[in-house]
């Protein structure tokens, strides 16, 4: 009986020490910082304050990092496409957070708010989040702005 207990103990110890945790060889996901270079291109607003936009509602924005200019097309609050242009800036606040702000060309003035901007990833798609204390927007990177009416 003593030999059986010893054999059982050794088998248990062998099983316990021969198992190792799986090794995750994937590199940690590191998203680049939002800069004039990394923001360049076309973006589509997909979520506003955590809610998906209605199917017939859209906002597209295209950034040119070299000139610090943007073009925006939206039908938020209108049944027709509104085209807006302007300039934008990317800065850092006192907590080293990236902040994006902008100004419209048509005399309307500044954007309503300045936003903390950061990149994120969902599946195989790149997203950019704009966040304030009271508002959040999630933009998906797209190849180009679609043809709009």
PLM regions with names:
Residues 15-18:
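C-terminal motif of bacterial Sec signal peptides marking the signal peptidase cleavage site
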Residues 47, 71-75, 100-106, 128-132:
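Short beta-strand segments that buttress and anchor functional surface loops
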Residues 41-67, 103-111:
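Short, solvent-exposed loop/hinge segments that bridge or flank secondary-structure elements
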Residues 53-97:
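N-terminal glycine/threonine-rich, aromatic-flanked beta-hairpin/loop signature
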Residues 1-8:
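Bacterial N-terminal signal peptides that target proteins for export
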Residues 96-121:
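An anionic, turn-rich surface loop/hairpin at beta-sheet edges
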């Amino acid at each position: 009986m003593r030999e059986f207990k010893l054999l059982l103990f050794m088998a248990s110890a062998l099983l316990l020490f021969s198992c190792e945790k799986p090794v995750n060889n994937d590199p940690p996901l590191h998203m680049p910082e939002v800069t004039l270079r990394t923001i360049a291109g076309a973006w589509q607003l997909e979520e506003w304050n955590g809610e998906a936009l209605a199917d017939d509602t859209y906002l597209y924005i295209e950034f040119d990092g070299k000139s610090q200019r943007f073009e925006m097309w939206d039908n938020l609050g209108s049944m027709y496409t509104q085209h807006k242009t302007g300039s934008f800036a990317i800065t850092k606040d006192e907590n080293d957070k990236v902040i994006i702000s902008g100004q419209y060309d048509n005399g309307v003035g500044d954007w309503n708010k300045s936003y903390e901007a950061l990149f994120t990833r969902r599946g195989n798609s790149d997203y950019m989040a704009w966040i304030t204390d009271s508002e959040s927007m999630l933009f998906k990177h797209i190849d180009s702005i679609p043809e709009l009416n």
